[in-house]
């Protein structure tokens, strides 16, 4: 199709003419917070649908001097938990008529450049779901008075708000569940050095075992992995079960790690789950339900995390100044066959 054949864009003036309203009424109809009679809004929307009208967000933001674009920084798109969280974030932003600009923080060499590029879009806020971007980059946004909300990251950036899952409560529940199942030599597996969430879960798990919640169980091994992937779980399991005294209960900081541990325990060491080994994960990804695993886990409420984050962001977009706030979202224990 050449330029002469390309269908011209429908304008707000076209919609106004068809609906029999003013141009400004069309603008108000597409602004969720604007004052406009319901019947007028519906007439405008009907005309827009009939004509195939789409709001020019860039033009609207330039006119109003208020951006509707929100930067979302994430990593590990192949990770089922992060994919679900990203989906819920998109939905939460859409409910507030905000437009996400997603940046992949997987490659540390490109993170800073990508984050700095977001500044050129004059975004209205930033949501960080990955541990990869350095806080110094997020600090740049705060200096431009752009709100920053971090999900499952440590609350150590003044002015930024944080939403986290209740890692401590989940870890204590994992310790208690393992002990009730009869496990006595326990191990923790997770990327403590690279992940705030794994670090928090490991610390709470260790504290639970040390203060009497464990009823005689001991923490035999804490294994720091490079990541929270299935491959890291495989490597960790080989180290754990090659030792002279194997653990009989393992708490993993993610479900993917737990699935890797189970695979190796069965295929390479002939262990039966849960008869010889109890395993608990964290996240409740779809694979945790598979018959091959039936993984007991702690479910993170991705919808709750997403909505809490966007609520904080929207509030900060209205009133930027104020102390940092932290919201803790409960987790839910899901009991399946791997540790009943």
Residue ranges, per PLM feature:
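Periplasmic-binding protein-like
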Residues: 122-130, 187-190, 223, 244-254, ...
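Short, well-structured alpha-helical segments in soluble
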Residues: 111-122, 232-245
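Flexible loop/turn connectors
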Residues: 243-340
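N-terminal helix-turn-helix DNA-binding module of bacterial transcription factors
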Residues: 1-67
């Amino acid at each position: 199709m050449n330029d002469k054949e390309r269908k011209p864009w429908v304008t707000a003036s076209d919609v106004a003419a068809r609906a029999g309203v003013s141009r400004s009424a069309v603008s108000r109809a597409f602004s969720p917070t604007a004052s406009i009679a319901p019947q007028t809004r519906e007439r405008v929307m009907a005309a827009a649908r009939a004509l195939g009208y789409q709001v020019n967000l860039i033009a609207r933001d330039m006119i109003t001097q208020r951006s509707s674009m929100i930067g979302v920084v994430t990593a590990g798109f192949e990770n089922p938990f992060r994919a679900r969280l990203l989906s819920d974030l998109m939905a939460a932003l859409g409910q507030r008529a905000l437009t996400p600009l997603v940046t992949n923080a997987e490659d540390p060499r490109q993170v800073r450049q990508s984050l700095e590029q977001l500044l050129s879009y004059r975004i209205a806020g930033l949501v960080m779901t990955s541990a990869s971007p350095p806080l110094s980059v997020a600090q740049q946004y705060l200096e431009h008075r752009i709100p920053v909300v971090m999900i499952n990251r440590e609350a150590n950036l003044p002015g930024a708000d944080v939403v986290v899952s209740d890692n401590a409560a989940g870890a204590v529940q994992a310790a208690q569940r393992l002990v009730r199942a009869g496990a006595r030599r326990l191990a923790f597996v997770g990327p403590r050095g690279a992940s705030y969430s794994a670090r928090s879960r490991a610390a709470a798990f260790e504290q639970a075992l040390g203060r009497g919640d464990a009823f005689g169980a001991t923490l035999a091994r804490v294994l720091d992995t490079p990541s929270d992937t299935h491959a890291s779980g495989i490597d960790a399991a080989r180290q754990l079960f090659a030792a002279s005294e194997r653990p009989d209960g393992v708490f993993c900081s993610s479900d993917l790690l737990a699935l890797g541990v189970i695979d190796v325990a069965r295929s390479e060491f002939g262990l039966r789950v849960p008869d010889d080994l109890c395993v608990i994960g964290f996240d409740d990804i779809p694979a945790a339900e598979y018959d091959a695993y039936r993984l007991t886990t702690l479910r993170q409420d991705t919808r709750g995390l997403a909505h809490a984050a966007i609520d904080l962001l929207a509030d900060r977009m209205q009133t930027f100044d104020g102390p940092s706030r932290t919201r803790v979202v409960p987790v839910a224990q899901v009991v399946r066959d791997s540790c009943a």
